[in-house]
Amino acid sequence: MLYAFTLGRKLRGEEPSYPEKGGKGGADKSAKYAAEAQKYAADLQNQQFNTIMNNLKPFTPLADKYIGSLEGLSSLEGQGQALNNYYNSQQYQDLAGQARYQNLAAAEATGGLGSTATSNQLSAIAPTLGQQWLSGQMNNYQNLANIGLGALQGQANAGQTYANNMSQISQQSAALAAANANRPSAMQSAIGGGASGAIAGAGLAKLIGSSTPWGAAIGGGIGLLGSLF
């Protein structure tokens, strides 16, 4: 009679036709797919992080270089040295010569040669050109320093984002390791739950890879977390 009831339940689909040996096969596949998804996510984070860092790397030295240049121009001594170099440059000689010619031509046209006004205009050429050059240099240094500072800030932001995302991945990987450790399996029967957790954690750490120092550190952390379960 019991057999008849059992057969009826199987025919109605209330029970499987053949008893399953357990969910080990499906669970193993699920764990494998989950680990592959974690690896893909970690690899993607590594690629994005490395791309950003490498793209910004050429610009980061500008910050140190041109902040130092600005510091040099912030003192009277530094400004004096810079202006002295400028006054001895061909650029200054050309601009000063052009300015003198224009002033003298205008004074000659108006009959003002030898006047105090003309003399004052000629004497103002050097300090005017010097201050214009110095102001332009400081603006250029500031702009270049800002480019470097922006690159450094971009790297810092990328590092923070990378750390946050990899922290989430490591937590998910640790949860996966815990689930694998707590799931009955042939491996656990053989070596025990604690050792299984350690193996799972070490495997996930390997999946993370070490394409960046961050990835290596987080991968090591995943192995440590996995060994706790």
Swiss-Prot record:
- Principal location listed in the UniProt entry: virion
Annotated Gene Ontology cellular component terms: virion component
Keyword Membrane belongs to the record: no
Mind listing the UniProt keywords for this protein, alphabetically? Late protein, Viral genome ejection through host cell envelope, Viral penetration into host cytoplasm, Virion, Virus entry into host cell
| Domain of life, per lineage | Viruses
Name the residues of the propeptide: 1-20
Task: State the compartments where it is located.
Answer: Virion
Q: What family name appears in the similarity comment?
A: Belongs to the podoviruses gp7 family.
SUBUNIT field? Interacts with the internal virion protein gp20; this interaction forms a tube-like structure that may allow DNA ejection through the host membranes.
Q: What does this protein do?
A: Inner capsid protein that plays a role in viral DNA ejection into the host cell. Assembles into an extracellular trans-envelope channel completed by the internal virion proteins gp7 and probably gp16. This channel allows the delivery of the viral genome into the cell cytoplasm. Displays membrane-association properties, may therefore form a simple channel spanning the outer membrane.
What is the protein name for this chain? Internal virion protein gp7
Name the encoding gene, please.
Answer: 7
